[in-house]
Amino acid sequence: MKLNTIKPGIGSAKPKRRVGRGIGSGLGKTCGRGHKGQKSRAGGFHKVGFEGGQMPLQRRLPKRGFTVYGKKQVREIKLSTLQLIDLSEFNPSVLYDHGLIKNINDPVKIILGNQLIKRAIKIKDLIISRGAKEAVEQMGGLVELTVKDVNGV
C-alpha cells in the first residue's frame, strides 16, 4: 500500500459537486441556486439572525440578568481524596504541594462524597461542609476554621 493509492471507504465521502457542466448533470446553468434573487448571486446572503427587515428575535426579547465578575469559583475536594495522601493534617499549602489545587489562594471546600474516612485527620483553614465536618469529628479528627465562607469573611 502506498499513500497515493489510499482511498476513503465506500460511502464515507460524498463526491465533489461539479456545477455548471450542462443540464444533464442536474447542476448545470443555475448551478442549483434557482433563478435570480439575493441567494443566487455571488456573495449574496444575509447575516445570521437577519429576518428580512423584521426586528430580529434577539432584539425582540428583553434583556435579563447580569454577569457577576467578582465571583470566585470554589474547588471542591472529597474526603476520600484526602484519604489517599498519607498525612494527618491538611491545609491549603499541603493541598497545593500535592497538586490538588492550582493556586494556594483559591477557595477550597472539603465535602463528604460517597465514602467515609477510615482514620483521624486534622483540617485547618479550609471551608468544610457540615457532613464532612461530622465525619471527621466522628473518627476523632479535628477541624479548625478561620475561613467562614468563599469571600474570606
From Swiss-Prot:
Pfam families for this protein: Ribosomal_L27A
- Role noted for this protein: Binds to the 23S rRNA.
The molecular function terms in GO held by this entry are:
rRNA binding; structural constituent of ribosome
- What protein family is recorded? Belongs to the universal ribosomal protein uL15 family.
Q: What is the lineage of its organism?
A: Bacteria, Pseudomonadati, Pseudomonadota, Betaproteobacteria, Nitrosomonadales
Q: Which InterPro entries match?
A: Ribosomal_uL15, Ribosomal_uL15/eL18, Ribosomal_uL15/eL18_sf, Ribosomal_uL15_bac-type
What's the subunit arrangement here?
A: Part of the 50S ribosomal subunit.
Keywords assigned = Ribonucleoprotein, Ribosomal protein, RNA-binding, rRNA-binding
Where is the sequence biased in composition, kind Gly residues?
A: 21-31
Name recorded for this polypeptide: Large ribosomal subunit protein uL15
Per the record, which residues fall in region Disordered?
A: 1-42
For this entry, list what GO says about its biological process: translation
Q: Which domain of life is it from?
A: Bacteria
Q: What are the GO cellular component annotations?
A: cytosolic large ribosomal subunit
